[in-house]
Amino acid sequence: DNIVTVSSKEQVQQENAQKPESAGESVYTDVTEATETPKTYESVTPPATGISEEENLAGDGDIHKVYLTFEDGPSDHTGEILDILAQYDVKATFFVVGKEDEESQALYQRIADEGHTLGMHSYSNKYSQIYQSDEAFEEDFERLRDELYQVTGVNSIYYRFPGGSSNQISNVPMSDFIHYLNEQGVIYYDWNVSAGDAASNAYSSEEIVANVMDDVVKYKTSVVLLHDASDKSATVEALAPLIEALNEMGAEILPIDEDTSVIQYVKADSID
């Protein structure tokens, strides 16, 4: 496995500035308990060797590997996205948040059943709660991991930090949380291509496609930031033409797995 350290933090800073924490809350403030037999989770050691962003730049003849990643769901748009992915026989990655309603839990199951990668994006998706302390982060993480296991039987080993691993929102050093995930055998993913659909003045579907295509041509491995929250109808509209454009350029569209080069703003192996 390879870790790609993204040297430029402009994208994550833009993401933090544009993405509201949740309705009525500032981004800067930011289940039922398990009663079953305690579970044993498979541990996967995070990759220890990294490649630079420069080494990830695509050259002539390189095949572009593109990983479509959706975060903030499930929502009423997630099913539509799954339908489109199925239509094109494309697998993606979903970094989900915690929800207890039957519809959302059915979507967790559908994501797993249809061969997509089920990742974690925190239970509450509220910065003020998640990043309040080491204990708060760990409690939030374990709550989501346990729920996904109980609902789907999947031991998720992939995580995306709300705001990314280099966010400036947390009052606790991000290295604390990275160290914890390393201990848990969990690999976290940032992104190196952004669709721009987190912005409050969201782009049109055509602009979303253009944003992605302008950047994926640069890299051997592109982890694309997309959102499947309830207000992201333009993302749904953009998905089919985006897949068609990626297919036309000869890209491989893949779900994150153990063979994926890891895109991280802060490398996991840089934390003791």
For each feature predicted by the language model, list its residue ranges.
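N-terminal, intrinsically disordered, polar/charged segments of Gram-positive cell-envelope systems
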Residues: D1-I63
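Short linear motifs in intrinsically disordered/low-complexity regions
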Residues: N2-I3, A17, V31, E248, ...
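Context-gated lysine
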Residues: K9, K19, K39, K65, ...
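Polar/charged alpha-helical tracts
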Residues: E10-Q18, D83, A106, D113, ...
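Compositionally biased, intrinsically disordered low-complexity regions enriched in proline and serine
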Residues: Q14-E15, T29, E42, D89, ...
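N-terminal start-of-chain detector that recognizes signal peptides
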Residues: P38-E42, K65, V90-K91, F161, ...
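Active-site beta->alpha N-cap acidic-glycine motif
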Residues: T40-S156, A245, S261
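Catalytic domains of cell-wall/extracellular-matrix polysaccharide-remodeling enzymes
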Residues: N125-L225, A229-N247, A251-E252, E258-D259, ...
